């Protein structure tokens, strides 16, 4: 912990289950992972075990997610966006389709709800179509609901 008080919150980012999550249990205020919902639940369960082992209240630690977010109206629109990204980045299309928050609006919003139910309190969204797409407009709808 930093010497100054109040100290800034300490984020421990990484999902290493033996070392990193143990450090998070001991010292962290927030943990941050890039995993699907099942992985988020798994990391949370392991973190909870580490918290019990070090005598820390698991609920004191904020669990957060960082990932790419790409939203489209329908599958055809999504395919077009992924094709454009793949061409621009030279990253295979499969990479994008495997990300948990890349899909249609309904798919992505449902997955975000699943993360919330799993205890995620904060999302750091990397928005690859920020300049030419409309994902950010879809995300703004989340704040209105």
What are the roles of these predicted feature ranges?
Residues 1-145:
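Active-site-adjacent structural elements that line small-molecule/cofactor binding pockets in enzymes
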């Amino acid at each position: 912990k930093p010497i100054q008080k109040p100290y800034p919150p300490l984020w421990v980012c990484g999902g290493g289950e033996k070392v990193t999550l143990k450090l998070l249990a001991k010292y962290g205020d927030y943990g941050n992972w890039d995993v699907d919902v099942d992985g988020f639940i798994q990391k949370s369960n392991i973190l909870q075990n580490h918290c019990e082992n070090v005598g820390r209240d698991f609920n004191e630690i904020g669990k957060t997610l960082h990932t790419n977010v790409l939203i489209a109206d329908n599958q055809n629109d999504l395919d077009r966006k992924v094709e454009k990204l793949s061409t621009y980045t030279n990253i295979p299309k499969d990479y994008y389709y495997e990300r948990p928050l890349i899909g249609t609006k309904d798919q992505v919003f449902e997955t975000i709800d699943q993360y919330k139910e799993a205890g995620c309190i904060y999302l750091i969204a990397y928005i690859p179509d920020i300049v030419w797409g409309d994902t950010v407009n879809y995300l703004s709808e989340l704040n209105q609901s």
